[in-house]
Amino acid sequence: MRQSKKLGQCFLKDKNFVKKAINRAEITNNDIVLEVGLGEGALTKELAKIAKKVYVIELDERLKPFADEITAEFENVEIIWSDALKVDLKNLGFNKIVANLPYQISSPITFKFLEEDFETAVLMYQYEFAKRMAGKPDTKEYSRLSVAVQYNADVEFICKVPPSAFSPKPDVNSAIVKLTKREPKYHVKDEEFFKKVLKAVFQHRNRTIKRALIDSSHEIEVDRDNLKGILEKIENEFDFTQRVFKTPPEKIGDLSNLLYDEIANLE
């Protein structure tokens, strides 16, 4: 079958990486596993041999012959023919996720997962995306993505995966990443506002926090002059001279809370 470029299909063929993903997810016969992207079923079959239940969300119904073969062999596999971004995941009851994700939905599907109550996710991403997810302050990989994902999950970069592990071979390297869900390590008063602050400051990651906020005041929906006034008012409560890429996540959380309170006072 010719894979769909539109759907970003690159099927994982190398069984060594299939086994590595399953091993790092520590799958047991009590686990209910979610997979996104059936492919030719290489990962699905190995999951089904161990897990109690495997849900697979797949959009491309041309893969039905592979699905039929797998469901005939494994009674614990259920295929959901739909767009993973549109499926209500709440009722599936999975506790682990293992998937070779279509790269063009990497960001939205990851944040959709993070809204759910799961233990562990072992996921395949484009290499550069994976490095940014795991990025730490004062590195070139540290980004809005790093802070947003690490807010309520620990991120472990497991290994680089070469194009030769897939069919067809993608033009880029890939990587396996493990996400372990947890409670946030710091408190933000409003998560949606926190996301706006992240977007605002990381548009200018090499600038100071103060300069980045002023230049992206529209992202937090505050008039530029009003924002300047707020920053002057709270200048002794936060180090606005620090560069964005050097500012730890919890400090950005503190910044978000300060701004949230001050903006509320404007209304």
UniProtKB/Swiss-Prot annotation:
Enzyme class: transferase
The name this protein goes by in its record: Probable ribosomal RNA small subunit methyltransferase A
A molecular function (GO) term: rRNA (adenine-N6,N6-)-dimethyltransferase activity
Places the protein is found: Cytoplasm
Function noted in UniProt: Specifically dimethylates two adjacent adenosines in the loop of a conserved hairpin near the 3'-end of 16S rRNA in the 30S particle. May play a critical role in biogenesis of 30S subunits.
Sequence intervals crossing the membrane: none
Gene behind this protein: rsmA
Family of the protein in this entry: Belongs to the class I-like SAM-binding methyltransferase superfamily. rRNA adenine N(6)-methyltransferase family. RsmA subfamily.
Primary localisation category: cytoplasm
Source organism of the structure: Methanococcus maripaludis (strain DSM 14266 / JCM 13030 / NBRC 101832 / S2 / LL)
